[in-house]
Structure formats: C-alpha cells, structure tokens
Amino acid sequence: MTLLVGLVLILVGLIAWNICIWGYIIKWGYRRYKRHRLETEIERLNLILRERAEDSGNESNGEEEERLEQLIHNYNHNNHFANPMFDL
C-alpha cells in the first residue's frame, strides 16, 4: 500500500513537472512570436518610409513615423534596453 502511494506521488510530481515545462515552452514561444511580429512590423514601416522619402512627390502625414517610433520604443522596452539617451 505504501509503495502504491509513493508511486502515485511520483507520478503526480512528474505530471506537474511536465506541465511546468510545457508552460515555459509555450510562454517562450509566444514571446518569440511577438518579438518576431514586432520586428517584421518595424521593418515594414521602415521600408515604407524609405520608399516614400525617395519618392519626392509623396509626403506622409507623420502617422507612420509616430507608429514606427512607438514600435521601436516597445521593442527596446520589451528587450530590456532602457537607455534614456536613446529614447525617441
């Protein structure tokens, strides 16, 4: 009987450990996905702004620049780069 209780406790512990590991993996993957999505959006906006700057007849109203600054600020904050000298 004691052996059975011990085996059940070990099994419960292994299941709990497995849940913790999978939770960490899912959390890490989600953070990586968010960072990739943010980097892609920054690159896309930067490309749009460069193309618009090269095309002299097409001026922006500043919304993309503000959005790009906000995305870069969020990217730096999320990656623990908090240097006030580089604040936009």
Swiss-Prot record:
What is the activity regulation comment for this entry? Ion channel activity is inhibited by hexamethylene amiloride in vitro.
According to Swiss-Prot or TrEMBL, what is its membrane topology? Answer: Single-pass type I membrane protein
Key words of the record: AIDS, Apoptosis, Host membrane, Host-virus interaction, Ion channel, Ion transport, Membrane, Phosphoprotein, Transmembrane, Transmembrane helix, Transport
On assembly, the entry states:
Homopentamer. Interacts with host CD4 and BRTC; these interactions induce proteasomal degradation of CD4. Interacts with host BST2; this interaction leads to the degradation of host BST2. Interacts with host FBXW11. Interacts with host AP1M1; this interaction plays a role in the mistrafficking and subsequent degradation of host BST2. Interacts with host RANBP2; this interaction allows Vpu to down-regulate host BLM sumoylation.
Q: Name one GO biological process term.
A: viral release from host cell
Q: Which residues carry this modification: Phosphoserine?
A: 56, 60
| Domain-level remarks | The N-terminus and transmembrane domains are required for self-oligomerization and proper virion budding, whereas the cytoplasmic domain is required for CD4 degradation. The cytoplasmic domain is composed of 2 amphipathic alpha helix that form a U-shape.
One GO cellular component assignment for this chain's record is: host cell membrane
Which regions span the lipid bilayer?
3-23
Protein's job: Enhances virion budding, by targeting human CD4 and Tetherin/BST2 to proteasome degradation. Degradation of CD4 prevents any unwanted premature interactions between viral Env and its receptor human CD4 in the endoplasmic reticulum. Degradation of antiretroviral protein Tetherin/BST2 is important for virion budding, as BST2 tethers new viral particles to the host cell membrane. Mechanistically, Vpu bridges either CD4 or BST2 to BTRC, a substrate recognition subunit of the Skp1/Cullin/F-box protein E3 ubiquitin ligase, induces their ubiquitination and subsequent proteasomal degradation.
Q: Where in the cell is it found?
A: Host membrane
Q: Which Gene3D superfamilies does the UniProt entry name for this protein?
A: HIV-1 VPU cytoplasmic domain (1.10.195.10)
Q: Please give the name of this protein.
A: Protein Vpu
